[in-house]
Structure formats: C-alpha cells, structure tokens
Amino acid sequence: MKVLVLLLVTLAVVYAAPDPRGILINLEDGEICMNSAQCKSSCCQHFSPLGVARCTRKASENSECSPKTLYGIYYKCPCERGLTCESDRTIIGAITNTNYGICLDAGRSKE
C-alpha cells in the first residue's frame, strides 16, 4: 500500500509542471529521437543505417521524400502539409523503407 501511495505521489509531482520542450516527446529539430511520434515535426530521420536518428523538418516542395514508414524512422522525411510525395510504391520498398519520391504541390501538379 505504501508503495502505491509513493508511486502516485511521484507521478503527481512529475506531471504537475511538465517541461514544454519535453524529454521523450515534443522534441525540437536536431534532437536525438527513436520514433517520429517524439518530434514536433513528426519526422525522425537518420542519414545512414548506423547513424543516430534526429528530429528534422519535413521535406519541402521538389525535395526527396518518403510517403510512409513502417518503423517510425525515415531516411527521407515525408512532405510538408499541402504537398504529396509522388513515388513508385512497392511492397519491398515499404519493407526496406526505400519508397522515395519527390514532394509536389497537389494543386499545381494537376494543372
């Protein structure tokens, strides 16, 4: 019973005044991450298979992109809001995280 009370008090103290920056979530660009859900930008990217993943801003128009990831970490970030990642999507590419494309403005590309 004492352990439960101590645990509840500890949790109350931890959540009483959360840091807006965050330690595990709400990470800024450049901070080390393990999953895109931790980043404010929603993109956790690593530049090599052995490299450390860091939060990075999403891809801008005409930049390389990944449409989706199964693992939460990207080699190429998805597009900014309002853009679409035009790519050849394959099952193998989805598994190996190599379905790369280019960010295009959906409104302009249909004209």
UniProtKB/Swiss-Prot annotation:
- Subcellular location(s) of the protein: Secreted
**SMART domains in alphabetical order:** COLIPASE
Keywords associated with the record: Digestion, Disulfide bond, Lipid degradation, Lipid metabolism, Secreted, Signal
Biological process GO terms, please? digestion; lipid catabolic process; response to bacterium; response to food; retinoid metabolic process
The pro-peptide lies at 17-21
Pfam families, alphabetized: Colipase (PF01114), Colipase_C (PF02740)
What PROSITE patterns does this protein map onto? COLIPASE_1 (PS00121), COLIPASE_2 (PS51342)
Question: Which InterPro entries does UniProt cross-reference here?
Answer: CLPS_chr, Colipase, Colipase_C, Colipase_CS, Colipase_N
Keyword rRNA-binding assigned: no
What domain of life?
A: Eukaryota
| Location, primary (coarse class) | secreted
Q: What molecular functions are annotated in GO for this chain?
A: enzyme activator activity; lipase binding
Question: PANTHER family from the entry?
Answer: COLIPASE (PTHR10041:SF8)
What family does the Swiss-Prot or TrEMBL record give for this protein? Belongs to the colipase family.
Annotated function: Colipase is a cofactor of pancreatic lipase. It allows the lipase to anchor itself to the lipid-water interface. Without colipase the enzyme is washed off by bile salts, which have an inhibitory effect on the lipase.
Complex formation:
Forms a 1:1 stoichiometric complex with pancreatic lipase.
Supply the name of the protein: Colipase
| Species this protein is from | Ictidomys tridecemlineatus (Thirteen-lined ground squirrel)
